[in-house]
């Protein structure tokens, strides 16, 4: 059986996008991993699946599978690629679509200049809802934010815990390019305080409207950009009194713009979404 796909990226965060409405998709975890493999498959940080919605008030259902075969709640860069995909494939003529994700609904808008704006919803800051086990950890306040001390490779690192539909631990560092992201990232990802694992963000403040960001993504490792990670970092920075909205987020893959008015207001992310190529892959070539 041949599986049709489209290869896309959002600021270098790359995806295999599958139309699950017009073709049957039923892959094993091993097949998901092989499809995402840069040696044995197409290669991607994550795989995005377009499906029919399960509720009447949305246009599509949006599923995300990590490179390790695990399914996750949300991906902001993927959401931008999602709306470009359904538009380019003629699956909708709307410029703005409502999309069902694992734990809610998001709104995606294709702008006239080709950029895509995603209404990411309000951030979740209550530890139990991140989810994050804060009990017993050292803590102190900075601005309106609570910082928690995690033991990481023999050091105590202070993080903010934020959910943007998926969990994030955000840490402010002086020099993000020379910070040991590849060493600390997996330790934070698997820290027992995060029962569902966590995306680890490392943020350097440039000025009150700009940051540099690296993210070690849960189930994918360090990626060139992470949309939900950019949102979580800006939320944490604003709450700590370090940033003012809007904020330009510089990643290795490109620039995103994040706006948030605080409190229960939604976070809005704007950035690029690029189609690279289309193809098909023989599922028989993938391990079962």
From Swiss-Prot:
EC number: 5.1.1.7
PROSITE patterns per UniProt: DAP_EPIMERASE
Site (Could be important to modulate the pK values of the two catalytic cysteine residues): 168, 217
Top-level EC class: isomerase
Keyword annotations: Amino-acid biosynthesis, Cytoplasm, Isomerase, Lysine biosynthesis
GO molecular function: diaminopimelate epimerase activity
Example GO biological process: lysine biosynthetic process via diaminopimelate
Enzyme active site: 75, 226
Catalytic reaction list: (2S,6S)-2,6-diaminopimelate = meso-2,6-diaminopimelate
GO CC term, one of those recorded: cytosol
Superkingdom per UniProt: Bacteria
InterPro entries: DAP_epimerase_AS, DAP_epimerase_DapF
Compartments (UniProt record): Cytoplasm
Pathway the protein contributes to: Amino-acid biosynthesis; L-lysine biosynthesis via DAP pathway; DL-2,6-diaminopimelate from LL-2,6-diaminopimelate: step 1/1
Binding site residues for substrate: 13, 46, 66, 76-77, 166, 199, 217-218, 227-228
Subunit record text: Homodimer.
Role summary: Catalyzes the stereoinversion of LL-2,6-diaminopimelate (L,L-DAP) to meso-diaminopimelate (meso-DAP), a precursor of L-lysine and an essential component of the bacterial peptidoglycan.
Family statement drawn from the similarity comment of this UniProt entry: Belongs to the diaminopimelate epimerase family.
Name assigned to this protein: Diaminopimelate epimerase
Phylogenetic lineage: Bacteria, Pseudomonadati, Pseudomonadota, Betaproteobacteria, Burkholderiales
Gene assigned in the entry: dapF
